[in-house]
């Protein structure tokens, strides 16, 4: 199936029936689909469940490339990685394809108010404001684009640990002080809600790009409290499972560090990933509440998608970057006016 066929078919159908619908593209960073250690019985995502009740859930949605920038570039252009030439996180889309028309750009040029909050395109550029604007494609894809940082209070950890003693700088967890809005995803949700309220009846395309559960696995402490560590069990691969091969990206550095994890460290990191997921889910709920309050479900297409999957210890791996199911399969949930909710499909989706 061609990439984005499902999304654009839904989009075109709703446009034909009702004029310009609103489009809410919600992206989650490093959010895996269910399976392995990460099951519906373990992780608490009431707002994803709430969205699924209104939507079609695609259970076999596969990304083009299991790394953030290549996957997002493919999603937003409709091109595979061999066509975009983007196979890493080091180059912005326009450096490779200066004249490509992206999905939000298409909507912007067709009359939608187009705004982005958080991570829709990969957020490169470091602390250089102009570089970051180029990375998020401000001006071309969006009327406005904004990203966010944790506050001083949100950077204060009430508990936490560097699991690999510095070997992998990203492999840390932290139960943070402060409120949801002291972390970026809370600010992203608040800004998205404010923009929805501000735009009123104008047709809009809003990208709401949550940054969790991507590492570092930090969330307000109350989300860690949802997962008492003594209620979790370490994952054990079936005996016939093949581990990630040494030829995999970063295996030497990563594999050595992962191989030293004790069962307790595995539980700590898994708990933190679940906590970050539940934190993101709570922010999703705030955005869904805005659609409820504004009465927008009958004129809004909602697309929730992950940029790729993630291993949480399966095959002795804690990352993406592989071609295994856990890394290549991503969440995809679509709600649209006139679509029956609570449906699932196992049709292959790119």
Show the residue positions of the predicted features:
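Hydrophobic h-region of N-terminal signal peptides that target proteins for export
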Residues: 8-17
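Sec-dependent signal peptide recognition
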Residues: 1-9
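Formylglycine-dependent sulfatase
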Residues: 2-3, 16-350
């Amino acid at each position: 199936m061609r990439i984005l066929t499902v999304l654009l078919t839904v989009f075109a159908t709703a446009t034909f029936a009702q004029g310009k619908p609103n489009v809410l593209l919600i992206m989650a960073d490093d959010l895996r689909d269910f399976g392995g250690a990460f099951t519906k019985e373990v992780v608490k995502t009431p707002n994803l469940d709430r969205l699924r009740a209104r939507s079609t859930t695609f259970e076999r949605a596969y990304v083009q490339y299991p790394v953030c920038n290549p996957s997002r570039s493919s999603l937003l252009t409709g091109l595979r990685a061999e066509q975009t030439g983007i196979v890493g996180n080091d180059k912005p889309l326009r450096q490779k394809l200066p004249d490509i028309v992206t999905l939000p750009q298409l909507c912007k040029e067709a009359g939608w108010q187009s705004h982005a909050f958080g991570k829709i395109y990969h957020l490169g550029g470091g602390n250089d404001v102009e570089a970051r604007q180029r990375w998020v494609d401000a001006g071309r894809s969006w009327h406005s684009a904004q990203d966010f940082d944790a506050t001083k209070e949100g950077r204060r950890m009430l508990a936490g640990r560097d699991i690999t003693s510095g070997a992998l700088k990203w492999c840390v967890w932290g139960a943070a002080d402060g409120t949801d809005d002291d972390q970026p995803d809370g600010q992203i949700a608040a800004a998205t809600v404010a923009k929805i309220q501000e735009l009123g009846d104008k047709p809009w395309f809003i990208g709401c790009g949550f940054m969790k559960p991507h590492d570092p696995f930090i969330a307000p402490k109350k989300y860690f409290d949802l997962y008492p560590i003594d209620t979790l069990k370490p994952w054990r691969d079936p005996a016939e499972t093949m581990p990630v091969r040494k030829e995999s990206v970063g295996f030497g550095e990563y594999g050595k560090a992962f191989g030293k994890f004790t069962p307790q460290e595995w539980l700590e990191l898994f708990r933190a990933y679940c906590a970050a997921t539940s934190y993101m889910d709570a922010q999703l709920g705030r955005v869904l509440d805005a659609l409820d309050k504004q009465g927008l479900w009958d004129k809004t297409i909602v697309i929730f998608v992950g940029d790729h999957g993630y291993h949480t210890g399966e095959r002795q791996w804690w990352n993406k970057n592989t071609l295994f199911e856990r890394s290549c399969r991503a969440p995809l949930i679509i709600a649209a006016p006139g679509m029956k909710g609570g449906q699932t499909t196992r049709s292959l989706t790119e």
